[in-house]
């Protein structure tokens, strides 16, 4: 099998041993646990750390335990040789890891998850570099939507499996939520313009939207850090700024 890493990664001493266990269990494509080398450098690296810790537990582990498919996540993963041999690594979007995962899901092939195969990835310190990186990811995700919505829809109709449906939800799920948010904000504005709402009412409605937007990500992050035994005290500044990190991603999606 091949194991894929970024050049700046630090690989846990037991990574290959734990991946080999998965290989011996019949898994052919397995994502390892993506941890962070520099989570406490500043609020940006802390944001990345919390994001990946959340993905590890709430996306990859949760889906794997439910019999669904995790996703390849850029680095720290294994692909068995006979998966690559027939046609090589054939992708055409900027998020080739997600694309490769979706192609496997369309074929009904479940990806594996190895929580004890750990790789430590370094994150950018500057906001400008982070903005460029996440813009690239967003463009790649949009490319995947254009390229794989139809094949996934066909797979859902033909195979009628929850794994195919989950893959379709992954690439399309954020769109309805985004549209719903815009609709709700628009309704509030129209009611205000039509004098059906006072300025105080408008302010209170905005607060109702914004407070959960700030509190829930922090609360969720703290719960995940507690479950994964991550040190919370050195991450307090990053936790406080985490909603801003996620909010900047929303601006990137608008771009």
Predicted regions and their residues:
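Membrane-embedded multi-pass helical conduit in multi-pass membrane proteins
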Residues: 170-255
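Short aromatic/hydrophobic "clamp" motif used to bind/position activated sugar donors
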Residues: 2
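Catalytic donor-sugar/metal-binding loop of nucleotide-sugar-dependent glycosyltransferases
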Residues: 101-119
């Amino acid at each position: 099998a091949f194991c894929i890493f970024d050049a700046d990664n630090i690989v846990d001493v037991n990574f290959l041993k734990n991946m080999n266990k998965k290989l011996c269990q019949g898994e052919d494509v397995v994502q390892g646990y993506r941890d962070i080398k520099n989570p406490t450098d500043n609020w940006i690296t802390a944001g990345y750390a919390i994001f990946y810790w959340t993905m590890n537990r709430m996306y990859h582990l949760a889906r794997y335990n439910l019999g669904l498919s995790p996703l390849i996540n850029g680095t720290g993963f294994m692909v068995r040789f006979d998966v690559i041999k027939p046609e090589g690594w054939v992708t055409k979007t900027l998020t080739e890891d997600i694309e490769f995962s979706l192609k496997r899901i369309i074929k009904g092939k479940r990806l594996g998850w190895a929580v004890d195969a750990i790789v430590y990835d370094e994150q950018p310190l500057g906001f400008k570099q982070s903005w460029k990186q996440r813009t690239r990811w967003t463009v790649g995700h949009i490319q995947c939507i254009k390229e794989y919505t139809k094949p996934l829809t066909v797979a859902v109709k033909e195979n009628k499996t929850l794994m195919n449906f989950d893959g379709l939800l992954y690439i399309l799920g954020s769109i309805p939520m985004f549209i719903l948010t815009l609709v709700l904000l628009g309704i509030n504005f129209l009611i205000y313009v039509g004098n059906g709402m006072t300025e105080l009412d408008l302010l209170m409605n905005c607060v109702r939207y914004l407070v959960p937007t700030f509190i829930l990500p922090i609360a969720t992050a703290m719960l995940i850090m507690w479950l994964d035994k991550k040190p919370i005290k050195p991450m307090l500044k990053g936790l406080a700024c985490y909603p801003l990190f996620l909010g900047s991603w929303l601006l990137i999606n608008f771009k």
